[in-house]
Amino acid sequence: NSSLQVSNKGFSEFSGLRTSSAIPFGRKTNDDLLSVVAFQTSVIGGGNSKRGVVEAKLKVAINGFGRIGRNFLRCWHGRKDSPLDVIAINDTGGVKQASHLLKYDSTLGIFDADVKPVGTDGISVDGKVIQVVSDRNPVNLPWGDLGIDLVIEGTGVFVDREGAGKHIQAGAKKVLITAPGKGDIPTYVVGVNADLYNPDEPIISNASCTTNCLAPFVKVLDQKFGIIKGTMTTTHSYTGDQRLLDASHRDLRRARAAALNIVPTSTGAAKAVALSSQALRGSSMALPLRVPTPNVSVVDLVVQVSKKTFAEEVNAAFREAADKELKGILDVCDEPLVSVDFRCSDVSSTVDASLTMVMGDDMVKVIAWYDNEWGYSQRVVDLADIVANQWK
Protein backbone atom coordinates (compact mmCIF):
# COMPACT_ATOMS: atom_id res chain seq x y z
CA ASN A 1 0.00 0.00 0.00
CA SER A 2 1.12 3.55 -0.61
CA SER A 3 2.34 5.31 2.50
CA LEU A 4 0.86 8.78 2.42
CA GLN A 5 1.82 11.74 4.55
CA VAL A 6 -0.19 14.83 3.79
CA SER A 7 -0.28 18.27 5.32
CA ASN A 8 -2.44 21.31 4.69
CA LYS A 9 -3.95 20.11 1.43
CA GLY A 10 -6.95 22.12 0.25
CA PHE A 11 -9.64 21.20 -2.25
CA SER A 12 -9.72 24.46 -4.20
CA GLU A 13 -6.23 24.52 -5.72
CA PHE A 14 -7.39 24.45 -9.32
CA SER A 15 -5.10 27.09 -10.81
CA GLY A 16 -1.94 26.40 -12.74
CA LEU A 17 -0.66 23.31 -14.47
CA ARG A 18 0.34 20.25 -12.55
CA THR A 19 4.10 19.67 -12.48
CA SER A 20 4.92 16.19 -13.69
CA SER A 21 8.17 14.30 -13.84
CA ALA A 22 9.17 13.77 -17.43
CA ILE A 23 11.90 11.90 -19.28
CA PRO A 24 12.79 11.85 -22.98
CA PHE A 25 10.67 9.31 -24.76
CA GLY A 26 11.37 7.89 -28.17
CA ARG A 27 10.11 4.71 -29.77
CA LYS A 28 9.59 2.13 -27.04
CA THR A 29 8.47 -1.45 -26.74
CA ASN A 30 5.64 -2.48 -24.45
CA ASP A 31 8.14 -3.51 -21.76
CA ASP A 32 9.86 -0.13 -22.07
CA LEU A 33 6.52 1.64 -21.63
CA LEU A 34 5.86 -0.26 -18.40
CA SER A 35 9.34 0.69 -17.23
CA VAL A 36 8.74 4.35 -18.00
CA VAL A 37 5.43 4.37 -16.12
CA ALA A 38 7.08 2.64 -13.16
CA PHE A 39 10.02 5.07 -13.26
CA GLN A 40 7.81 8.14 -13.29
CA THR A 41 5.71 6.78 -10.43
CA SER A 42 8.79 6.14 -8.32
CA VAL A 43 10.28 9.62 -8.74
CA ILE A 44 7.10 11.65 -8.32
CA GLY A 45 7.03 13.06 -4.82
CA GLY A 46 10.74 12.35 -4.35
CA GLY A 47 13.33 14.82 -3.16
CA ASN A 48 12.94 17.31 -0.36
CA SER A 49 9.53 17.46 1.27
CA LYS A 50 7.47 20.58 0.71
CA ARG A 51 4.39 21.85 2.43
CA GLY A 52 1.26 20.22 1.06
CA VAL A 53 3.17 17.54 -0.89
CA VAL A 54 2.61 13.84 -0.28
CA GLU A 55 5.62 11.57 0.16
CA ALA A 56 4.15 8.83 -2.05
CA LYS A 57 1.37 9.28 -4.54
CA LEU A 58 -1.63 7.02 -4.94
CA LYS A 59 -1.44 5.07 -8.21
CA VAL A 60 -4.68 5.74 -10.09
CA ALA A 61 -6.27 4.12 -13.14
CA ILE A 62 -9.22 5.52 -15.08
CA ASN A 63 -11.70 2.94 -16.37
CA GLY A 64 -13.67 4.47 -19.23
CA PHE A 65 -12.20 7.49 -21.01
CA GLY A 66 -15.46 9.20 -21.93
CA ARG A 67 -16.84 12.55 -20.80
CA ILE A 68 -16.12 12.12 -17.08
CA GLY A 69 -12.88 10.19 -17.60
CA ARG A 70 -11.37 12.93 -19.76
CA ASN A 71 -12.76 15.74 -17.59
CA PHE A 72 -11.27 14.00 -14.55
CA LEU A 73 -7.84 13.83 -16.17
CA ARG A 74 -7.95 17.51 -17.10
CA CYS A 75 -9.07 18.50 -13.60
CA TRP A 76 -6.37 16.38 -11.98
CA HIS A 77 -3.73 17.79 -14.33
CA GLY A 78 -4.63 21.30 -13.18
CA ARG A 79 -4.17 20.57 -9.47
CA LYS A 80 -1.04 21.57 -7.60
CA ASP A 81 0.67 18.95 -5.44
CA SER A 82 -1.98 16.30 -6.03
CA PRO A 83 -1.69 13.14 -3.91
CA LEU A 84 -2.80 11.20 -7.00
CA ASP A 85 -0.74 9.83 -9.87
CA VAL A 86 -2.75 8.72 -12.91
CA ILE A 87 -0.68 5.98 -14.53
CA ALA A 88 -3.21 3.99 -16.57
CA ILE A 89 -6.37 4.34 -18.65
CA ASN A 90 -8.66 1.59 -19.89
CA ASP A 91 -10.27 2.71 -23.15
CA THR A 92 -11.58 0.60 -25.99
CA GLY A 93 -11.17 3.30 -28.63
CA GLY A 94 -7.41 3.09 -29.01
CA VAL A 95 -4.52 5.42 -28.23
CA LYS A 96 -4.94 7.73 -31.22
CA GLN A 97 -8.59 8.43 -30.42
CA ALA A 98 -7.97 8.79 -26.67
CA SER A 99 -5.21 11.36 -27.15
CA HIS A 100 -7.13 13.30 -29.80
CA LEU A 101 -10.34 13.54 -27.75
CA LEU A 102 -8.35 14.56 -24.67
CA LYS A 103 -6.61 17.35 -26.57
CA TYR A 104 -9.58 18.62 -28.58
CA ASP A 105 -12.94 18.95 -26.84
CA SER A 106 -16.06 20.57 -28.30
CA THR A 107 -17.20 21.70 -24.85
CA LEU A 108 -13.97 22.39 -22.98
CA GLY A 109 -11.93 23.67 -25.90
CA ILE A 110 -8.32 22.77 -26.65
CA PHE A 111 -6.44 21.28 -23.69
CA ASP A 112 -3.54 23.53 -22.67
CA ALA A 113 -1.11 20.64 -22.52
CA ASP A 114 1.16 18.74 -24.89
CA VAL A 115 -0.81 15.57 -25.64
CA LYS A 116 0.36 12.89 -28.05
CA PRO A 117 0.19 9.13 -28.55
CA VAL A 118 3.14 7.02 -27.43
CA GLY A 119 3.35 3.94 -29.59
CA THR A 120 0.21 1.83 -29.51
CA ASP A 121 -0.31 1.65 -25.76
CA GLY A 122 0.37 5.00 -24.18
CA ILE A 123 -0.33 8.72 -24.25
CA SER A 124 1.96 11.51 -23.12
CA VAL A 125 0.53 14.54 -21.29
CA ASP A 126 3.17 17.25 -20.86
CA GLY A 127 5.82 14.54 -20.89
CA LYS A 128 4.07 12.27 -18.41
CA VAL A 129 3.41 8.88 -19.97
CA ILE A 130 0.14 7.15 -19.12
CA GLN A 131 -0.34 3.54 -20.18
CA VAL A 132 -3.48 2.78 -22.19
CA VAL A 133 -5.01 -0.69 -22.03
CA SER A 134 -8.13 -2.00 -23.71
CA ASP A 135 -10.44 -4.65 -22.26
CA ARG A 136 -14.19 -4.51 -21.66
CA ASN A 137 -13.95 -6.98 -18.77
CA PRO A 138 -12.36 -5.34 -15.70
CA VAL A 139 -11.24 -8.73 -14.36
CA ASN A 140 -8.70 -8.92 -17.20
CA LEU A 141 -7.12 -5.52 -16.55
CA PRO A 142 -3.46 -5.39 -15.36
CA TRP A 143 -4.18 -3.49 -12.15
CA GLY A 144 -2.17 -5.92 -10.04
CA ASP A 145 0.90 -5.74 -12.29
CA LEU A 146 0.72 -1.93 -12.30
CA GLY A 147 0.19 -1.70 -8.54
CA ILE A 148 -3.03 0.29 -8.92
CA ASP A 149 -4.32 1.67 -5.63
CA LEU A 150 -7.51 3.39 -6.84
CA VAL A 151 -9.67 2.92 -9.94
CA ILE A 152 -11.84 5.80 -11.11
CA GLU A 153 -14.78 3.83 -12.52
CA GLY A 154 -16.14 6.10 -15.25
CA THR A 155 -18.03 3.81 -17.60
CA GLY A 156 -21.38 4.08 -15.84
CA VAL A 157 -21.67 0.31 -16.20
CA PHE A 158 -19.91 -1.20 -13.17
CA VAL A 159 -21.89 0.58 -10.46
CA ASP A 160 -22.72 -2.26 -8.05
CA ARG A 161 -20.49 -4.34 -5.79
CA GLU A 162 -20.27 -7.20 -8.24
CA GLY A 163 -19.30 -5.01 -11.18
CA ALA A 164 -16.99 -2.57 -9.39
CA GLY A 165 -15.54 -5.49 -7.44
CA LYS A 166 -14.06 -6.85 -10.66
CA HIS A 167 -11.41 -4.14 -10.45
CA ILE A 168 -10.42 -5.45 -7.03
CA GLN A 169 -10.31 -8.99 -8.43
CA ALA A 170 -7.92 -7.60 -11.05
CA GLY A 171 -5.59 -6.31 -8.34
CA ALA A 172 -6.76 -2.78 -7.55
CA LYS A 173 -7.19 -1.90 -3.89
CA LYS A 174 -10.14 0.51 -4.05
CA VAL A 175 -12.75 1.80 -6.52
CA LEU A 176 -14.45 5.20 -6.79
CA ILE A 177 -17.61 5.09 -8.93
CA THR A 178 -18.42 8.30 -10.84
CA ALA A 179 -22.16 7.63 -10.83
CA PRO A 180 -24.84 6.70 -8.30
CA GLY A 181 -23.90 3.36 -6.79
CA LYS A 182 -26.42 0.55 -6.61
CA GLY A 183 -27.19 -1.48 -3.52
CA ASP A 184 -25.39 -0.69 -0.29
CA ILE A 185 -22.37 1.10 -1.79
CA PRO A 186 -21.51 4.13 0.42
CA THR A 187 -22.19 7.47 -1.27
CA TYR A 188 -20.20 10.60 -0.47
CA VAL A 189 -20.80 14.19 -1.57
CA VAL A 190 -17.93 16.60 -0.94
CA GLY A 191 -19.11 19.44 1.28
CA VAL A 192 -22.03 17.42 2.60
CA ASN A 193 -21.00 14.09 4.11
CA ALA A 194 -17.49 13.37 2.81
CA ASP A 195 -16.18 14.03 6.33
CA LEU A 196 -17.80 10.70 7.23
CA TYR A 197 -15.69 8.79 4.69
CA ASN A 198 -14.74 5.35 5.98
CA PRO A 199 -11.31 4.30 4.64
CA ASP A 200 -12.17 0.66 5.31
CA GLU A 201 -14.68 0.74 2.43
CA PRO A 202 -13.10 -0.63 -0.77
CA ILE A 203 -15.87 0.68 -3.07
CA ILE A 204 -17.52 4.10 -2.84
CA SER A 205 -19.67 6.35 -5.03
CA ASN A 206 -19.42 10.07 -5.78
CA ALA A 207 -23.20 10.18 -6.43
CA SER A 208 -24.54 11.96 -9.53
CA CYS A 209 -23.78 15.42 -10.90
CA THR A 210 -27.29 16.56 -9.96
CA THR A 211 -26.92 15.29 -6.39
CA ASN A 212 -23.62 17.14 -6.10
CA CYS A 213 -25.39 20.34 -7.17
CA LEU A 214 -28.47 19.85 -5.04
CA ALA A 215 -27.13 18.47 -1.77
CA PRO A 216 -24.91 21.40 -0.68
CA PHE A 217 -27.58 24.10 -0.83
CA VAL A 218 -30.25 21.72 0.50
CA LYS A 219 -27.96 21.22 3.48
CA VAL A 220 -27.92 25.00 4.04
CA LEU A 221 -31.70 25.28 3.71
CA ASP A 222 -32.32 22.44 6.12
CA GLN A 223 -29.86 23.70 8.73
CA LYS A 224 -31.11 27.28 8.61
CA PHE A 225 -34.83 26.90 7.99
CA GLY A 226 -35.80 23.25 8.46
CA ILE A 227 -37.11 21.43 5.39
CA ILE A 228 -40.47 19.67 5.64
CA LYS A 229 -40.85 18.40 2.07
CA GLY A 230 -40.03 19.41 -1.45
CA THR A 231 -39.78 18.72 -5.15
CA MET A 232 -37.00 19.26 -7.66
CA THR A 233 -36.76 19.58 -11.43
CA THR A 234 -33.41 19.59 -13.19
CA THR A 235 -33.18 20.98 -16.70
CA HIS A 236 -30.24 18.86 -17.77
CA SER A 237 -28.07 18.93 -20.88
CA TYR A 238 -28.27 15.83 -23.01
CA THR A 239 -25.71 13.09 -22.39
CA GLY A 240 -24.03 10.29 -24.31
CA ASP A 241 -26.70 7.87 -23.14
CA GLN A 242 -29.23 9.51 -25.49
CA ARG A 243 -29.60 9.08 -29.22
CA LEU A 244 -28.50 11.64 -31.80
CA LEU A 245 -31.37 10.52 -34.06
CA ASP A 246 -34.34 8.31 -33.17
CA ALA A 247 -32.94 4.85 -32.48
CA SER A 248 -33.28 1.86 -30.20
CA HIS A 249 -32.93 2.46 -26.45
CA ARG A 250 -34.27 0.68 -23.37
CA ASP A 251 -35.84 4.02 -22.34
CA LEU A 252 -38.36 4.94 -25.04
CA ARG A 253 -37.97 8.66 -24.32
CA ARG A 254 -34.17 8.56 -24.55
CA ALA A 255 -34.59 6.69 -27.82
CA ARG A 256 -35.69 10.00 -29.37
CA ALA A 257 -33.35 12.55 -30.99
CA ALA A 258 -31.54 14.40 -28.20
CA ALA A 259 -30.90 17.61 -30.14
CA LEU A 260 -34.54 17.99 -31.18
CA ASN A 261 -36.49 17.24 -28.01
CA ILE A 262 -37.06 17.97 -24.36
CA VAL A 263 -36.78 14.49 -22.89
CA PRO A 264 -38.21 13.58 -19.46
CA THR A 265 -36.14 10.83 -17.88
CA SER A 266 -35.15 9.58 -14.42
CA THR A 267 -32.74 10.58 -11.65
CA GLY A 268 -31.64 9.22 -8.30
CA ALA A 269 -31.11 12.71 -6.90
CA ALA A 270 -34.24 12.68 -4.71
CA LYS A 271 -33.05 9.56 -2.93
CA ALA A 272 -29.43 10.68 -2.64
CA VAL A 273 -30.28 14.17 -1.37
CA ALA A 274 -31.32 12.51 1.91
CA LEU A 275 -27.57 12.61 2.57
CA SER A 276 -27.97 16.30 3.41
CA SER A 277 -31.55 16.39 4.73
CA GLN A 278 -33.15 13.56 6.64
CA ALA A 279 -36.43 15.46 6.30
CA LEU A 280 -36.37 14.79 2.57
CA ARG A 281 -35.98 11.03 2.98
CA GLY A 282 -39.15 9.70 1.38
CA SER A 283 -40.76 13.16 1.22
CA SER A 284 -39.23 14.58 -1.95
CA MET A 285 -39.66 14.01 -5.66
CA ALA A 286 -37.37 14.75 -8.60
CA LEU A 287 -37.86 15.04 -12.35
CA PRO A 288 -35.07 15.56 -14.89
CA LEU A 289 -35.75 17.10 -18.29
CA ARG A 290 -32.97 16.55 -20.83
CA VAL A 291 -32.70 19.50 -23.20
CA PRO A 292 -30.78 20.24 -26.45
CA THR A 293 -27.64 21.75 -24.89
CA PRO A 294 -24.32 19.86 -24.63
CA ASN A 295 -23.33 20.97 -21.15
CA VAL A 296 -24.36 22.92 -18.02
CA SER A 297 -27.61 22.17 -16.22
CA VAL A 298 -29.88 23.92 -13.73
CA VAL A 299 -31.80 22.72 -10.69
CA ASP A 300 -35.19 24.16 -9.70
CA LEU A 301 -35.97 23.25 -6.09
CA VAL A 302 -39.18 24.06 -4.21
CA VAL A 303 -39.37 23.19 -0.51
CA GLN A 304 -41.66 23.87 2.40
CA VAL A 305 -39.72 25.03 5.47
CA SER A 306 -40.63 25.14 9.15
CA LYS A 307 -39.07 28.53 9.90
CA LYS A 308 -40.72 31.60 8.38
CA THR A 309 -38.36 33.45 6.06
CA PHE A 310 -37.99 35.73 3.03
CA ALA A 311 -35.84 35.67 -0.13
CA GLU A 312 -33.08 37.99 1.10
CA GLU A 313 -32.61 35.92 4.24
CA VAL A 314 -32.38 32.72 2.20
CA ASN A 315 -29.74 34.23 -0.08
CA ALA A 316 -27.83 35.54 2.93
CA ALA A 317 -27.64 32.00 4.29
CA PHE A 318 -26.23 30.79 0.97
CA ARG A 319 -23.67 33.61 0.87
CA GLU A 320 -22.48 32.83 4.38
CA ALA A 321 -22.05 29.14 3.59
CA ALA A 322 -20.29 29.92 0.30
CA ASP A 323 -17.77 32.09 2.17
CA LYS A 324 -17.20 29.59 4.97
CA GLU A 325 -17.88 25.87 5.23
CA LEU A 326 -18.90 25.41 1.57
CA LYS A 327 -16.24 27.62 0.02
CA GLY A 328 -15.20 26.10 -3.30
CA ILE A 329 -18.34 23.96 -3.35
CA LEU A 330 -21.21 26.50 -3.37
CA ASP A 331 -21.33 29.92 -5.01
CA VAL A 332 -23.92 32.69 -5.33
CA CYS A 333 -24.42 34.69 -8.53
CA ASP A 334 -26.01 38.14 -8.73
CA GLU A 335 -25.57 38.66 -12.47
CA PRO A 336 -28.31 37.89 -15.05
CA LEU A 337 -26.40 35.01 -16.66
CA VAL A 338 -27.32 32.05 -18.86
CA SER A 339 -26.16 28.45 -18.95
CA VAL A 340 -23.03 28.87 -21.10
CA ASP A 341 -21.65 31.35 -18.56
CA PHE A 342 -21.27 28.51 -16.08
CA ARG A 343 -19.23 26.29 -18.37
CA CYS A 344 -16.11 25.02 -16.56
CA SER A 345 -17.35 26.33 -13.21
CA ASP A 346 -15.28 24.59 -10.51
CA VAL A 347 -18.02 24.65 -7.87
CA SER A 348 -20.75 22.05 -7.45
CA SER A 349 -23.61 24.56 -7.57
CA THR A 350 -24.15 28.27 -8.11
CA VAL A 351 -27.33 29.73 -6.64
CA ASP A 352 -28.94 32.33 -8.92
CA ALA A 353 -29.80 34.88 -6.23
CA SER A 354 -32.12 36.97 -8.41
CA LEU A 355 -34.36 33.93 -8.95
CA THR A 356 -34.76 32.95 -5.28
CA MET A 357 -38.40 33.25 -4.26
CA VAL A 358 -40.43 32.77 -1.08
CA MET A 359 -44.17 32.17 -1.43
CA GLY A 360 -46.10 33.11 1.66
CA ASP A 361 -43.39 32.77 4.25
CA ASP A 362 -42.68 29.05 4.24
CA MET A 363 -42.34 27.88 0.61
CA VAL A 364 -38.90 28.51 -0.87
CA LYS A 365 -37.88 28.25 -4.52
CA VAL A 366 -34.16 28.10 -5.39
CA ILE A 367 -32.51 27.98 -8.81
CA ALA A 368 -28.91 26.70 -9.00
CA TRP A 369 -26.61 26.20 -11.99
CA TYR A 370 -23.97 23.51 -12.38
CA ASP A 371 -21.51 22.28 -14.97
CA ASN A 372 -22.61 18.67 -14.95
CA GLU A 373 -19.28 17.49 -16.39
CA TRP A 374 -16.49 19.80 -15.18
CA GLY A 375 -17.86 20.72 -11.76
CA TYR A 376 -18.72 17.09 -11.08
CA SER A 377 -15.26 15.93 -12.16
CA GLN A 378 -13.68 18.42 -9.77
CA ARG A 379 -15.57 16.72 -6.96
CA VAL A 380 -14.39 13.31 -8.15
CA VAL A 381 -10.82 14.57 -7.82
CA ASP A 382 -11.67 15.99 -4.38
CA LEU A 383 -13.10 12.67 -3.19
CA ALA A 384 -10.12 10.78 -4.60
CA ASP A 385 -7.89 13.20 -2.67
CA ILE A 386 -9.81 12.34 0.51
CA VAL A 387 -9.27 8.64 -0.19
CA ALA A 388 -5.54 9.30 -0.67
CA ASN A 389 -5.19 11.46 2.41
CA GLN A 390 -6.90 8.84 4.59
CA TRP A 391 -5.32 5.83 2.93
CA LYS A 392 -5.17 2.59 4.84
Curated annotation (Swiss-Prot):
PROSITE patterns, A to Z: GAPDH
Subcellular location: Plastid, Chloroplast
Residues engaged in binding NADP(+): R67, I68, D91, R136, N372
Family to which this protein belongs: Belongs to the glyceraldehyde-3-phosphate dehydrogenase family.
Record's keyword annotation contains Thylakoid: no
E.C. no: 1.2.1.13
Catalytic activity, as annotated: D-glyceraldehyde 3-phosphate + phosphate + NADP(+) = (2R)-3-phospho-glyceroyl phosphate + NADPH + H(+)
Record-linked PANTHER family: GLYCERALDEHYDE-3-PHOSPHATE DEHYDROGENASE 2
Subunit record text: Tetramer of either four A chains (GAPDH 2) or two A and two B chains (GAPDH 1).
Keyword annotations of the record: Calvin cycle, Chloroplast, NADP, Oxidoreductase, Plastid, Transit peptide
Catalytic residues as annotated in Swiss-Prot or TrEMBL: C209 (nucleophile)
Positions contributing to D-glyceraldehyde 3-phosphate binding: S208, C209, T210, T239, R254, T267, G268, R290
Gene Ontology molecular function: glyceraldehyde-3-phosphate dehydrogenase (NAD+) (phosphorylating) activity; glyceraldehyde-3-phosphate dehydrogenase (NADP+) (phosphorylating) activity; NAD binding; NADP binding
Site (Activates thiol group during catalysis): H236
Gene: GAPA
A GO BP entry: reductive pentose-phosphate cycle
Keyword Protein biosynthesis: no
The protein's name: Glyceraldehyde-3-phosphate dehydrogenase A, chloroplastic
Annotated pathway: Carbohydrate biosynthesis; Calvin cycle
Broad class of the protein's primary localization: plastid
Protein source organism: Nicotiana tabacum
NCBIfam families cross-referenced by the UniProt entry: GAPDH-I (TIGR01534)
EC category: oxidoreductase
Stretch forming the transit peptide: 1-56
InterPro entries per UniProt: GlycerAld/Erythrose_P_DH, GlycerAld_3-P_DH_AS, GlycerAld_3-P_DH_cat, GlycerAld_3-P_DH_NAD(P)-bd, Glyceraldehyde-3-P_DH_1, NAD(P)-bd_dom_sf
Domain of life: Eukaryota
